[in-house]
């Protein structure tokens, strides 16, 4: 995480001068220099970075150059929108991808399986912003049944703002969540399909058939259980990926989350927000990988057996 923070912090010093966006053309060079000194921009990079790390360890990421507000407050405000979008997208990708993957893995030569695999190529081939624009044009412009931007009406619960408790909020999250989930969904479809096809050819499945176990029990109890083990790993990592790549989706749909805040920060060269965002993403990936490793140990008996053998 420190490496990610340092590299990103160093690169941000070459994206432009934030002072140009903070003051007008009539501002004198002396006033610009004084503002740089006040913000600490005249200090060497390693000094700025050390100050950033010390403050970040206390939950302080500085003041936004653009909004003149503490970055930590901005993150707290925008985080609920991103979390809700990512959670819904992850559920759509995991549930739909698993069901379609199982179906195409069991019915390998079916006509519907070919259609599903062909359509899934669109999720991989088309960029996210193109899919988002197409959805907006179809469902918001032509049909007019879903909103094209924004989060809708939200309810303030004190520590959290949610759109799940309002009709407009639920309608507003449909298009961006489906758009964000498509790429991960197609990946899960192909992963589950490949796992099911491989497992159905293994010796213990053939032995189960020889014992007279029903075909449905073999497919949906024995094969599916083992086929979902790698999916859990991918699904966990995909949550971090969805948060990182929600930038494009949030920008297309003007979704007021952290990704949209990051894009605005890049346009304004708001270094405190950009640095805090990337540190947050790195932290999310570290924590998700840690949790997935723990879940993997409890789900996959082979890992427990290896651990018992090595400890014994």
Residue ranges and their predicted role:
Residues 42-98:
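An internal, D/E-rich "acidic patch" concept
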Residues 79-112, 160-312:
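Alpha-helical transmembrane segments of integral membrane proteins
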Residues 14-15, 123-126, 243:
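Transmembrane helix irregularities
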Residues 3, 7, 11, 15, ...:
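Alpha-helical membrane-inserting segments
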Residues 118, 122-126, 130-185:
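Membrane-water interface segments at transmembrane-helix boundaries in multipass membrane proteins
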Residues 31, 35, 45-61, 71, ...:
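Hydrophobic alpha-helical segments of integral membrane proteins
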Residues 2-50, 143-165:
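Hydrophobic alpha-helical transmembrane segments of membrane transport/permease proteins
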Residues 8-12, 132, 136, 140, ...:
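Juxtamembrane/transmembrane-helix interface segments of polytopic membrane transporters
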């Amino acid at each position: 995480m420190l490496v990610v923070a340092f590299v990103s912090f160093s690169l941000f010093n070459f994206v432009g001068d934030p002072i140009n966006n903070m003051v007008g053309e009539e501002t004198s060079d002396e006033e610009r220099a004084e503002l740089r000194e006040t913000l600490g921009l005249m200090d060497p990079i390693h000094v700025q970075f050390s100050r950033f790390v010390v403050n970040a360890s206390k939950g302080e990421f500085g003041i936004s150059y653009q909004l003149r507000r503490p970055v930590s407050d901005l993150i707290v405000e925008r985080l609920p929108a991103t979390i809700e979008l990512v959670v819904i997208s992850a559920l759509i990708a995991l549930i739909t991808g698993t069901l379609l993957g199982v179906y195409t893995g069991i019915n390998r030569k079916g006509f519907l399986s070919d259609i599903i695999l062909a359509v899934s190529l669109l999720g991989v081939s088309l960029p996210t912003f193109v899919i988002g624009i197409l959805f907006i044009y179809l469902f918001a412009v032509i049909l007019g049944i879903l909103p094209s931007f924004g989060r809708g009406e939200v309810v303030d619960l004190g520590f959290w703002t949610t759109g799940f408790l309002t009709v407009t909020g639920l309608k507003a999250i449909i298009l961006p969540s489906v758009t964000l989930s498509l790429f991960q969904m197609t990946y899960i479809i192909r992963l589950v399909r490949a796992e099911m096809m491989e497992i159905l050819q293994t010796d213990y499945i053939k032995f189960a058939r020889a014992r007279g176990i029903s075909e449905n029990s073999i497919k949906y109890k024995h094969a599916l259980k083992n086929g979902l083990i790698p999916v859990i790993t991918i699904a966990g990592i995909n949550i971090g990926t969805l948060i990182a790549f929600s930038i494009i989706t949030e920008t297309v749909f003007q979704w007021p989350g952290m990704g949209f805040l990051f894009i605005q920060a890049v346009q304004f060269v708001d270094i405190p927000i950009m640095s805090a965002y990337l540190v947050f993403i790195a932290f999310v990936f570290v924590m998700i990988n840690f949790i997935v490793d723990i879940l993997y140990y409890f789900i996959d008996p082979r890992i427990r057996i290896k651990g018992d053998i090595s400890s014994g």
